[in-house]
């Protein structure tokens, strides 16, 4: 795993947050550099809003009494922290990951249906929705941010699910949203020259490399 540096305080935190609009008192906040907003540039404001621990990829300003954790990759750190925060729920499930250029959604629902017919209780995370028991949550991304993935795993465990079938996008892999998940089975549907562009992958080679993670 990437190296990390902790200084200068050890602090208990109440919640894990990565969205600066959702900072809560005494939380651990993970700075993420996005396409249009980089929370590394707003750490003093985030600390004033209540964060007691700030995780960042580069040295940032924090007030006295706030713990700063420096990591090589904050998205990777968020994934590992989220798993720990929710008590590693994926270890209590059989997780099946499905990736590929085309067919992920169809395959995910097919596998879910087959397993349910065999008597298993199955959760699903995918492009259309996340399904946890009788609860259906509309999706914003094929593979949600790692914090949400782990939160959904925890809710599946609580709901009595034995298996989770999830779509795994190349963007999700590239951004470490699935880092640390102990996949029981991986299914690769196909690979085609798609998702190439300034907001996705720079080249087909990069796209293929992400699919192979």
Regions found by a protein language model. Give the residues of each.
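Positively charged, low-complexity/disordered segments
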Residues: 1-11, 167
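Short, conserved micro-motifs enriched in small and acidic residues
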Residues: 2-3, 40, 63, 143
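Structural motif
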Residues: 3-4, 21, 46, 88, ...
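Pocket-edge positions in alpha/beta enzyme catalytic cores
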Residues: 4, 69-70, 141, 199
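Generic alpha-helical segment signature
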Residues: 5, 71-74, 89, 204
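N-terminal leader/targeting and accessory segments in enzymes
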Residues: 8-80
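Phosphate-binding loop of NTP-binding sites
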Residues: 78-213
